[in-house]
Amino acid sequence: MEIFIEPIGKLINEFSKLPGVGKKTAQRYAYKIIDMPESEARAFADAILGVKRKVKYCKVCGNFTEEETCAVCRMRDHSLICVVKEPKDVAAIEKLHEFKGVYHVLHGVIDPLSGIGPNDIRIRELLARLQEGNVKEVIVATNPDVSGDATAMYLAKLIKPFDVTVTRLAHGIPIGSEIEYTDDVTLARAFVERNKL
């Protein structure tokens, strides 16, 4: 016999599909939705559907946007590209208000153990941007872990023939950590003290 009636069980099941949300947390979320006024629940549902309908990837950098090209790509210095693993890394860096260039979101890193190779992430698109000839520096801001380092070294090797400076974020970001969770001061210092690859 099921513990929850079908609509509640279904909602709990959907919430538990989110990263970091176990059954207990999913139950709390479901109970909260049940207790919400219908207008708030409808606004919550509309926000979810709005994201799915309106948000797409920038055709230049791969970050989230509602347009063909994101605001960063439309208004920033294209001679400086910061390469990141995923869009949430862009958000973490943008919070600092330090970086004045544009981004390139790989949507992953090279991870042979997970079956992710160079052709599975947006490396070809980065090389196409470099072929335009306007880029002076590429900052590789992948996470300081095995996959992030492997991706950084692979990119440095590919970028070398373009006569573009390739740098990596400096020390201060702990090995094995994720950029998204790095505090603002540490992340800002890592940008200022970035290293050549």
For each feature predicted by the language model, list its residue ranges:
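Cys/His-rich Zn2+-binding cysteine-cluster or related metal-binding knuckle/ribbon modules and their
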Residues: E2-I8, K17, T25-V90
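Long C-terminal interaction/binding lobes of large macromolecular proteins
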Residues: L127-I139, P144-L197
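Core recognition of P-loop NTPase motor domains used across DNA-transaction enzymes
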Residues: S39-G50, K59-V60, A71-V72, A91, ...
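Signal for well-folded cores of large energy- and translation-related assemblies
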Residues: S16, I34, L49, G62, ...
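S-adenosyl-L-methionine-dependent methyltransferase catalytic core, i.e., the SAM/SAH-binding region
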Residues: I8-S16, Q27, I33, F64, ...
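Extended interfacial segments that mediate partner engagement and assembly in macromolecular machines
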Residues: A26, R74-I139
